[in-house]
Curated annotation (Swiss-Prot):
Pathway: Carbohydrate degradation; glycolysis; pyruvate from D-glyceraldehyde 3-phosphate: step 3/5
Subunit record text: Monomer.
One biological process term in Gene Ontology: glucose catabolic process
Organism the protein comes from: Synechocystis sp. (strain ATCC 27184 / PCC 6803 / Kazusa)
Record's keyword annotation contains Glycosyltransferase: no
Stated name of the protein: 2,3-bisphosphoglycerate-independent phosphoglycerate mutase
Keywords, in A-Z order: Glycolysis, Isomerase, Manganese, Metal-binding
Keyword field contains Transmembrane: no
Purpose: Catalyzes the interconversion of 2-phosphoglycerate and 3-phosphoglycerate.
Binding site for substrate: 126, 156-157, 188, 194, 258-261, 331
GO terms assigned for molecular function: manganese ion binding; phosphoglycerate mutase activity
Reactions catalysed: (2R)-2-phosphoglycerate = (2R)-3-phosphoglycerate
Enzyme type, top EC level: isomerase
Name of the encoding gene: gpmI
Amino acid sequence: MAEAPIAPVVLVILDGWGYRPDTRANAIAQANTPIMDSLIAAYPNTLVNTSGKDVGLPKGQMGNSEVGHLNLGAGRVVPQELVRISDAIEDGTFFDNQALIEVCQRVRDRRGKLHLIGLCSDGGVHSHIDHLLGLIDLAKLQGISQLCIHAITDGRDTPTNEGAHFVQQIQAHLEKIGLGRIVSVSGRYYALDRDRRWDRVEKAYRVMTEDGVGDGRSAAQVIKDYYASDITDEFIPPTRIGAGAIASGDGVIFYNFRPDRARQLCYALVNPSFDGFPRERIQPLDFVTFTQYDPALPVVVAFEPQNLNNILGEIISRQGMKQFRTAETEKYPHVTYFFNGGLEQPFAGEDRELIQSPMVSTYDKAPQMSAKAVTDAVCRAMEKGIYSLVVVNYANPDMVGHTGKLKEAIQAIETVDLNLGRLLASAAKVGGTVLITADHGNAEYMSDESGNPWTAHTTNPVPFILVEGEGRKIPGHGGEVKLREGGKLADIAPTILDILQLPVPAEMTGKTLIDQPLVEIKANRTPVNLSR
């Protein structure tokens, strides 16, 4: 007799779906969302925090997808690289970092140039300008004679036209210490693509590596001139400011601390088997990255990764259970690499399906993105009846929210709501329990008080909804399930283990969001098959 299909726990991550009571510029509140509205009216729900110290960031710092998925998968507050590096600068250990000192020494001995590449803003999502200023000070202390800055402008995790201000801040610091120059600028749309759009990356690569000089304008003036043509920070074309191309014998420090958007440019610069576009590999080239972008890259890492043990995916695997992860291209690393604590390889029994994102310049041109295909993949996985845990990310609220286009963001929200209905119907057929949440806010705040487009994340909380499978009750919790208030993303993995009747390891300092019953109920904590 065939085994009954497994009724999975399905974790649905609505990327960028925050909660904000004010409906002004709120794509979520203004959208027609009958599915989410009915869930909030009928099922246990609460709000969880996704920013600041609740996710391992500085107080008041907005969360992001990497941080959110790390905390979701780890079941604990994970200290973030932003804090780790900032603390090192503050306590002085940054200036003793062996990887940074050695690249400076080799460049100095060869009388080469030291190049600093990274996102120039205080957004704190992929980088921080204070880290660049710290590197400039380090170069001065180490006796570097030629320092070249390749500035990547933001406009996504910061307001759309602050790039000129940031490069002026950098230029002032260079002049103050008497070292260095900004030699190129490029919008992150080009230099930090993560969807294998190599034509974009190539433009940034050429400006950084091919000889040339500017036209005499400063970096700030170049950026301001682009503003006058309605080109904002994210989309500034790669532009040469002055002499200082990356060449044989030079050294590079890539100071983004978040890997996903730094990888492709790194591949082009150092990967011997790179084939994204024609280029001659620059050798020798000493290359340091702030954090580990990819274990296969031939680079030196300044801040080695933190090891996270007993995370959710590992526990599920160790129990002999199968799990499934899916998302479209833009968020695929988040449900795999980041959810697994920075591990590239899947755990035993972990299956993955990558859905291609639409090939458009910006996602306001396709607000539906690939939500339908993502839902199809989830439904197929659940129907197999073999997975105890399913993790899915819907990218639409975040990726369309980043465009600052309210009308299109509303369409994105309505697309996700429609597909959520399909997912829930499929889960109901197999008795699955569905947990719906988000990794951070975004689409609930599309413009500031002055009406200017807001393209960054927010510090708002996000919903958490628990939809029990029909006829199912959460083991060990008696009758009606109630969720507690004041939770955070780190509490969701312990909640999943609670539902699956698996013990929560000591490393998981998060606490289940399910309120404990007043009367203790003795429950069999042996893993169970939640089949019908």
